[in-house]
Structures are given as structure tokens and as C-alpha cells.
Amino acid sequence: MNPALQSDDAVIQPRKGKGDPALGPDALMVVISRDLARLSKLKPMDGFDQGFFKIFRGKGQTEAGLSLAGPFLGAPQAAMVMEKIIALGAKRICLFGWCGSLQPDLRIGDLVIPLHAIAEEGTSKHYPIGKRKPSTDTGLNRILERALEHEGLPFRKGTV
């Protein structure tokens, strides 16, 4: 059997390539292309084509501010994008996207701040999360809650 298949170590380590942008510690992964296009126009941004996804960072910024990355479809591609932006410098990563709901009182367009996740997509089992539920960063959640409250936007919190 191939020794690489018997190891939990990565076979290929993502790294910064020639011409790749350096990113600051904060990044927003954006699932839907239309959302990425809208968010990237909120302020002047430089764009970097990565082949199957794009990266945006503030015009003229180097290693500071919020970067955007996307779009992507499915957990395997999301994992590849996340690994790449980590290699470029991202440390705190949030995801902006859509999801379905098993809660009958949630409606299309409701804002939900995830606290935990139920992972059933096939990629997460390859990450060492053990017996605990994957959970979000409480500090980042508080920042998001305050921002939404400041804007007067209603939201819910819960498991996704």
C-alpha cells in the first residue's frame, strides 16, 4: 500500500506561490459568486485570480485589513480555498453563505450566527475534531453580534 495513504499528514502542503498576494489575518470566505461580486465592490479592492477562485483585498493594502475569497462549491473546494488563504496569511476566517434549515420558524433571508455545526458533507471526517461538535469562535461571534445589533439587523444563533 502507498505510505502516503497510511498517514494523517498532508500529501501536498499549500504554500504561497509566485505572484500570490500576502493576506492579513482576517478573511471572509464567500460561497456565492454574486455575493462575492457585491462585497468586493463595497470599497476599492485589488483582485487576484487563483484559477478556480478569486481573492480580493483592499486597494493597495499589504497584509492588513479584511480579505475576501471565493466563490466555491462544496466542502472539498472550500477546504482547498481555506488551506490556500491560510498559506497566504489568513488566521481568522469566517464564511459568508447560505444554508438550509430544519427549523420551521426560520425563513429565507433570516440571519443565523452559527454556534456549532453538524458536519455531514464528507470532508470534515478527515479533520481531527474528535468527539466534540465543531464550534465557532465566541470572540468572533460577539463581534458579529455587536455589528448586526448596531445596524439594527435581527439575527438568530444556533447549530447549522
Protein language model annotation of sequence segments:
Residues 1-143:
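Metabolite-binding pocket within alpha/beta catalytic cores that recognizes anionic/polar moieties
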